[in-house]
């Protein structure tokens, strides 16, 4: 789609406003809305000025002017606003150089794709994330000097089987780890998920599947067709936006938080990925799991740099409450065909053109631009340096003898450990100027503040363990 096409859409659909969107460092969508009458072809060359100092982890107030540069290919109508509004995703551009801002996540993702092409290894990287989420009826939390708490509720939750309702208790509910995946009325979110899928398709995505997930209390998943790196990261933001707003319209609240419930499965973002060149899938071969040597080396790079990748792929303190044994979360850095206890799975496919790997440890607190770019850079490092991942692990990794378990590397056990790993293992990310040391340092500082805030906060469980000592 070209700027002329966008202007034609504005005319045909009688668009009143254009919503300029971008992702901050944390991956949260930000937006500023302008009248459609202010958008012309020059807007796609000159952009729109804005104050970058208000975005956490970006510029100081003394050098705050930045440019939102709309990408015409991302134009899509917003399905939620009252007035006809067109969404345009933007890159963040430095006014002095008119180049992508080095801390802009989308610009980093673009540089990763460009670097991949410059190596000659591949011309296409495909990503297919599976974003899991919960749908709750009520959520409350507080954290201040007088105390801290959180409370979630869902009419579907197993803990409500004994609750007295004015109109009677519906009775049909998935229990703990019982949501995957009985038909309605046990699955009470069929119609809501379908409404979400309808919205996603109206916004240009190709929905492949939707279903209830394992956990009680409304855990769900919507599968969307894979896409190239930057386009798929764009789609992840649109998917989260659509899911949360459709839930809101139904009087519900949706969250992609990795571990909102204690004692049941958390929300992951398993990321399927593959490389191609001249239309040929480079991951398809005749080695283990139908993989090529290139794919095995890509896996080797992911495993080698996994702890640094955790900083981008599991980008919250809450992420590491999910990455524990016993809840289908992959903590072992191993690969296997069809074995979901390994952190990297090779899905079974009939068509070699669909051959891919699935990296299972990420979650949706990741900024998709940064996470996908970082995984691509790790995989390329594995290919360039012929890093073999070792033998596949086809046994149940959740039930290993202690001596075998110790021999297998694991993902980080905390966010601060992941940030330390990123600080020490960053060279593979800075090749080709994809990530810069300045960006990584700013990310470490921003995320370190989250670690410090939680570390300094008294937790209710501490009262349970220590109050009476």
Curated annotation (Swiss-Prot):
Residue sites binding ATP per the record: 208, 272-274, 340, 345, 353
Catalytic activity: L-glutamate + NH4(+) + ATP = L-glutamine + ADP + phosphate + H(+)
Broad EC category: ligase
InterPro entries: Gln_synt_N (IPR008147), Gln_synt_N_sf (IPR036651), Gln_synth/guanido_kin_cat_dom (IPR014746), Gln_synth_cat_dom (IPR008146), Gln_synth_gly_rich_site (IPR027303), Gln_synth_I (IPR004809), Gln_synth_I_adenylation_site (IPR001637), Gln_synth_N_conserv_site (IPR027302)
Pfam family of the protein (one): Gln-synt_C
Example of a GO biological process term: glutamine biosynthetic process
GO cellular component assignments: cytoplasm; membrane
Cofactor: Mg(2+)
SUPFAM superfamilies xref list: Glutamine synthetase, N-terminal domain, Glutamine synthetase/guanido kinase
Cofactor note: Binds 2 Mg(2+) ions per subunit.
A single MF term (Gene Ontology): ATP binding
Binding site for L-glutamate: 265-266, 322, 328, 340, 360
Localization (cell): Cytoplasm
Positions bound to Mg(2+) 1: 130, 270, 358
Residue ranges constituting the GS catalytic domain according to the UniProt record: 105-469
Modified positions (O-AMP-tyrosine) in chain numbering: 398
Domain of life: Bacteria
Keyword Membrane recorded: no
Entry EC no(s): 6.3.1.2
Protein activity control: The activity of this enzyme could be controlled by adenylation under conditions of abundant glutamine.
Function per UniProt: Catalyzes the ATP-dependent biosynthesis of glutamine from glutamate and ammonia.
NCBIfam families: GlnA (TIGR00653), PRK09469.1 (NF007006)
Assembly information from the UniProt record: Oligomer of 12 subunits arranged in the form of two hexameric ring.
Family of the protein in this entry: Belongs to the glutamine synthetase family.
Protein name per UniProt: Glutamine synthetase
Source organism (scientific name): Methylococcus capsulatus (strain ATCC 33009 / NCIMB 11132 / Bath)
